[in-house]
């Protein structure tokens, strides 16, 4: 009797799986691993190095990979062409995302459009020019801190990025490594990816909302409290100190007090608060990840470091620090920046774009509600675009190319996202990272740390999985490039 039950159960499982397989193929869904009833592909999903693992699936399934997680359809886009065809050219269909209050997670509607308009108004290429002196000052102060305590280079990068963002958003200068607003914001960002994941899990399995005592509910309550603190406290501080900063040209002052003199309504002010919060989340971690990846790359590739430093010396000299005005005359440094962004990929995956209606592409049916995730890491390590993708090789960007080739090869085409959800902060983030990188090249040399016997300890090129791809903690030696560096850095005076 027992054997009959077992056999019947196995037969039922086979029938269910077969029906699931046939149903998928009849609907011409894109290929992907076959899941199991109810859970779908939940057990197939990687718990770490998600972008790299899913990129590897392309060898079997191609550049469009379809999976379901507890009934929710996902489409992973590993190829640049497929991503641009769908998320850029058909952005009207692929712009939904309603997973939280931050701008990148807001549903595509009137609120999102207002918030994006506010961000574009403050972050256009022309608008961010007013912050170039601030970028220079914070970069130079970062150099001074590294000179004084080189072993704390990561905290120095974090303070520089935090102060740069907080000053440009709120007109608030960060004066210590223990600044309460920066610490609160970093704490929030450290848990945000986990909180978002918990939110997705409830979306996949709605019945979990009604199961008491789950850790998810406790975490959701903590997320809500931290979200409100992060949004409300900096804004309240900004308004309380308005009278003390009459010359402040920050993002919040510009938007709260328009030049036309017309007061804004309460709804617009509420949106400004959320936009300000989103700008910190998007800008600070990206800057720290990019610059720490750069330092790691220079340690691992001393020949690249030396070649870039020689170019800086030839153009800038050794009697001053680089400025943004030098950028056009430093083509190899530009190549190093691009290769760092490609090799390190500070943002490996995009936030999901929800498909608002059924679509068809290359003979495949894409169901309404599908969450489309662009695998930026896969695109930036695609050997069809970047031969020898795992080699750190800045020279790949040299030589004559037409406009389309240049666009496809430039990592910024991918790093800042796609379609109507492309990050508008590119005009602020890119110059900030470039100036930080070239200033470090100008003043310091980065080499491996030494063990007790004086042997070099080469750090591995390993990265922490998460929304932002930071290198695993590593040690190194940071030494002034020449005897004039200390005096050069010390002579820098705050401009504000």
Swiss-Prot record:
A GO molecular-function annotation: oxidoreductase activity, acting on paired donors, with incorporation or reduction of molecular oxygen
Class of enzymatic activity (EC top level): oxidoreductase
UniProt cofactor(s): heme
A cellular component term, taken from the record's GO annotations: membrane
Entry's family note: Belongs to the cytochrome P450 family.
General function of this protein: Cytochrome P450 monooxygenase; part of the gene cluster that mediates the biosynthesis of clavilactone A, a meroterpenoid that features a unique benzo-fused ten-membered carbocyclic ring unit with an alpha,beta-epoxy-gamma-lactone moiety, forming an intriguing 10/5/3 tricyclic nested skeleton. ClaR, ClaS and ClaT are sufficient to produce clavilactone A. Within the pathway, claT acts as a multifunctional cytochrome P450 monooxygenase that catalyzes a ten-electron oxidation to accomplish the biosynthesis of the 10/5/3 tricyclic nested skeleton in clavilactones.
Protein name listed in UniProt: Cytochrome P450 monooxygenase claT
Organism: Ampulloclitocybe clavipes
